[in-house]
């Protein structure tokens, strides 16, 4: 599978997870200029700067290993790190997301008065992959993309929108726009015998030479797809597809769960935009053996914060996306009994992570959930259903299968067959 995406997004992450569940190998090409990419992903910039597979071997650069002039030092104050020449600060060192690792994301070089005049970007393999020169207003006017030997390979003249490719043989080439650069690179990287999964409809004209039978378009929802359907063999819904009426040529990936890979853990998740979560306090007290993870995008009201004293409660106000993803993968129970709108399509994500939905018919966020045996009329009935699962963990997988059957979630075998046809050009 060859995935073409405009950038790394949540939808791309979800598509990759679905393909992983199906055991489908894939490569990713993002049509932007990122330089900090994993080994299976390439961009317009890395296509030119990382030709050698050895360029994708290494680890992030430790801040003390930065190459600086003699007698210069790297100083750290808390999470603030900078380069010091003995008299004054010469640069900020911005660390990667895992701050405790003390590895370098970028270096912001100062001119006069600590005004940032250029930025060096370091990738996950430990070498400088990009340098940006800035105007007095702090905007980049020239982006320079480097290879591991620190040779300038691709120059982006930002204000003009042009690109200059510098080759070792001196046969430099000018691209008048990013679109021209995209087209030139894609013509070289498009596979001859792989299925192509396109996530950017603006590039449909670029991939028109790909046989329709090997081309699929990945969408986040089912809106405004009629024109695209005529140009591809399949449309794959990766985000907003659960519970929709089935349509020819449109395949839902969202909700896919591999039941055999799941195992029961007495961990429950509720994602809420309101402090009104019916029955939550009773459940917390009734089931001390279950850890309840309560998450929200904002601060929490007292009805939730008052539960913090319970040993089996964990609160996550202002939860990050990464932590949310961690909880989805570690919990086996999802509570859909909160008032207000659903956050982040969390019940759907819970389903595809093998969580059993428990909730109240008066509160569930999708009408079809009311057909599930674990969605009840009262808190007392919900507690009885939860008690059964806790006493008989072997019932967990059967409940997950029941959910998939009643909600008509994607079937792994059917999707495996679909991708097999795409790869073979018979879809």
Predicted feature residues:
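N-terminal subdomain of nucleotide-sugar transferases
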Residues: 1-68
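Repetitive, compositionally biased segments used for assembly/scaffolding
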Residues: 69-181
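Catalytic core of nucleotide-activated saccharide and alditol-phosphate transferases
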Residues: 168-267
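Conserved catalytic-core segment of nucleotide-activated headgroup transferases in glycan assembly
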Residues: 248-306
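Conserved active-site histidine-acidic residue motif and adjacent donor-binding/catalytic loop
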Residues: 298, 316-327
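Nucleotide-activated donor-binding/catalytic signature segment of Leloir-type glycosyltransferases, i.e.
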Residues: 302-319
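Catalytic binding pocket for nucleotide-activated donors in carbohydrate/polymer assembly enzymes
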Residues: 333-406
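C-terminal alpha-helical cap of glycosyltransferases
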Residues: 405-427
